């Protein structure tokens, strides 16, 4: 891969793995952070804020590929992508790779709607583009379960299924795509198995050595129907290999 790659969201769960893998491939990596960071890790750290636009023009200057792993909440997410696209266009960026989520076009929750709007901005940017959708990371599911375990009862969305994937596997695919040309919508990346939410919650509680009453909760309306219909899943793209049990073992050891 020739030229510099800018990674946004470089300190996040996915972004830091992408940065690490690109550096290991010998790629010149520029990483965007809202706070100043020291180098020494083979990375050129730059300060910028996608929401305000501060520092973004400088961040994209001289860059061939932008990998957007950043996430903000709601409308700010869309505004951030618009800012990135505008500055990347001015700088002559060759390829913009945007990481999204499986089901953003099927599950009508606000966060997913914002992601879908971001995809549209990328598609209409005039830049060469790739969008990669992935299912939920093990890390996200663990954070949700950590929060649920602090409640008197553990809520379980009735009928919901999850296809969690290892973030390292998604990062590896992102790093590959960054070295290729614009691909439009790339094949999705899903975890190895589609599993009931309840089954994953039970596995978490066993691994954590916790006891909680699991409380079935019916998710109402169109969101509930979309989840029960598997709108958040991509069973035909179950290409991940790392299991949720392996993530639990890494987190809790032999507990």
Question: What is each model feature region?
Answer:
Residues 100, 117-140:
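Conserved beta-loop-beta element that borders a ligand/cofactor-binding pocket
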Residues 44-46, 50-96, 113-124:
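NAD(P)-cofactor binding segment of oxidoreductase domains
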Residues 130, 143-165, 169:
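A conserved pocket-lining segment of Rossmann-fold NAD(P)-dependent short-chain dehydrogenase/reductase
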Residues 8, 32, 69-70, 96-101, ...:
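SDR active-site strand-loop-helix element
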Residues 31-37, 49-51:
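N-terminal Rossmann-fold cofactor-binding loop
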Residues 2-27, 33:
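N-terminal Rossmann NAD(P)H-binding glycine-rich loop of SDR-like oxidoreductase domains
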Residues 2-4, 13, 168-255:
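Mid/C-terminal beta-alpha module of Rossmann-like enzyme folds, strongest
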